[in-house]
């Protein structure tokens, strides 16, 4: 009601920020030539399921990082130690991998990781290949080889859409993956080689921490609504303006 009620009594129009939000997301996913790449992070598949399903149909390349990558890795038979994982979503992860393949969307997972035995400040960490994660370890960030993989793909696309941090960015040094990729996107955007769109609460916080957010083409302030737009859903506040 909060986004639709006023329009029942008064003439209503979208504001400049809403116009730009819709324009930039539509441009990133639907308009123009060139390949499109998505970066999806965060902790859970369940919170971004519809986003993942929609993006496999819209994008040429989709990188999955953050905690949700662990569920995909486990679904593919990798050991993930004590890492965050949604075991109830394993079948869903397999289905998304299959859908991406059928839609010719290249879905990429981490090839290495930064691991630790706990999430305490100052904890010791190490770099391992993704098939070498010990049983007592936590995957807390993507590793340097994965950063290289993402950056190499970024150089081949015209548009990048980002939603969700790639590691436990609140704890040093597990912000490294997020900051490194943000730096590369910033560089390519400034060189006018890339249109870059990012959004989602944690994403905005992580990018602000990296100080590279100012160079992105567009940073969404819509929070959860950004996810809904990425998922291809109709938002009540927008639909009512079409009447």
What residue ranges belong to the model's regions?
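Active-site loop-to-helix "anion-binding N-cap" substructures in soluble metabolic enzymes
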Residues: 1-243
């Amino acid at each position: 009601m909060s986004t639709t009620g006023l329009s029942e009594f008064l003439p209503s129009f979208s504001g400049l920020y809403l116009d730009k939000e819709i324009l930039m997301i539509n441009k990133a996913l639907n308009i123009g030539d060139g390949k499109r790449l998505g970066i999806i992070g965060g902790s859970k598949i369940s919170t971004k399921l519809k986003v993942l399903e929609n993006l496999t149909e819209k994008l040429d390349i989709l990188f999955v990082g953050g905690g949700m990558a662990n569920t995909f890795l486990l679904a593919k038979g990798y050991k993930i130690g004590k890492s965050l994982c949604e075991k109830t979503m394993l079948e869903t992860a397999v289905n998304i991998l299959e859908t991406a393949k059928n839609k010719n969307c290249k879905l990429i997972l981490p090839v290495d990781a930064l691991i630790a035995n706990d999430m305490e400040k100052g904890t010791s960490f190490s770099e391992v290949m993704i098939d070498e994660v010990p049983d007592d370890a936590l995957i807390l960030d993507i590793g340097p080889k994965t950063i290289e993989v993402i950056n190499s793909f970024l150089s081949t696309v015209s548009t990048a859409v980002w939603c969700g941090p790639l590691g436990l960015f609140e704890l040093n040094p597990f912000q490294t993956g997020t900051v490194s990729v943000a730096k590369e996107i910033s560089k390519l955007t400034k060189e006018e080689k890339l249109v870059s769109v990012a959004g989602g609460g944690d994403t905005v916080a992580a990018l602000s921490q990296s100080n590279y957010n100012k160079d992105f083409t567009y940073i969404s302030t819509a929070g959860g609504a950004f996810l809904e737009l990425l998922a291809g859903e109709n938002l009540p506040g927008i639909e009512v303006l079409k009447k």
